[in-house]
Design a protein with these regions (language model features):
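Conserved beta-strand-loop-beta-strand element in the redox core of flavoprotein oxidoreductases
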Residues: 135-157
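Local beta-strand N-terminus motif with an aromatic residue
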Residues: 13, 157-159
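Glycine-rich Rossmann-fold phosphate-binding loop(s) that bind the pyrophosphate
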Residues: 20-22
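Conserved N-terminal/central alpha/beta ligand/cofactor-binding core
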Residues: 6, 12, 25, 29-137, ...
């Protein structure tokens, strides 16, 4: 069950993250942990942290990224450790330089873990809405994003 806390429906944020898949969750958590007032806009809050049909974390490529995210204080590795069903060392027949780790995870438990991490994070507001457009200011040949337009909440501004 998703538990969204609208701490306040402030429409001005330091950072706005669109989507709450793996990278959206990590981006929202990282910016809020750095003290930025952060919004994460999701179309369906029940899909926060939702894993694909192959619910695994790790492997030769993704395992490298997960390790780096973990070293920087990210949540993906913690969620994988808390919700794994199976743990494997891959490429055992080869040398230790190419060994990698992979977990198969319970996708429902993983999503619940990530939902709890976002809901309980200070400086983070979850907004269930659809981003329809970016607000872009073209200033002296240096365009930058000022915020987003959403279907139900209108304009959300960012720094």
């Amino acid at each position: 069950m998703v538990n969204i806390k609208y701490k306040s429906m402030n429409k001005s944020f330091d950072v706005i993250v669109i989507g709450a898949g793996h990278s959206g969750c990590e981006a929202a958590l990282a910016s809020s942990r750095l003290g930025c007032n952060t919004a994460v806009v999701v179309m369906d809050a029940s899909k926060i942290g939702w894993m694909s049909c192959n619910p695994s974390i790790g492997g030769p490529a993704k395992g490298q990224i997960v390790g780096e995210i973990d070293a920087l204080g990210g949540e993906m590795g913690k969620a994988a450790d808390a919700t794994f069903l199976q743990f494997r060392v891959l490429n055992r027949s080869k040398g230790p330089a190419v060994h990698s780790y992979r977990t198969q995870n319970d996708k429902y438990d993983y999503a619940a873990y990530m939902n709890d991490a976002l809901v309980n994070q200070s400086n983070l507001t979850i907004i269930e809405d659809m981003v329809t457009d970016l607000i872009i200011e073209d200033d002296n040949d240096s365009p930058h994003v000022l915020g987003v337009h959403t279907k139900f909440h209108g304009e959300l501004l960012s720094k």
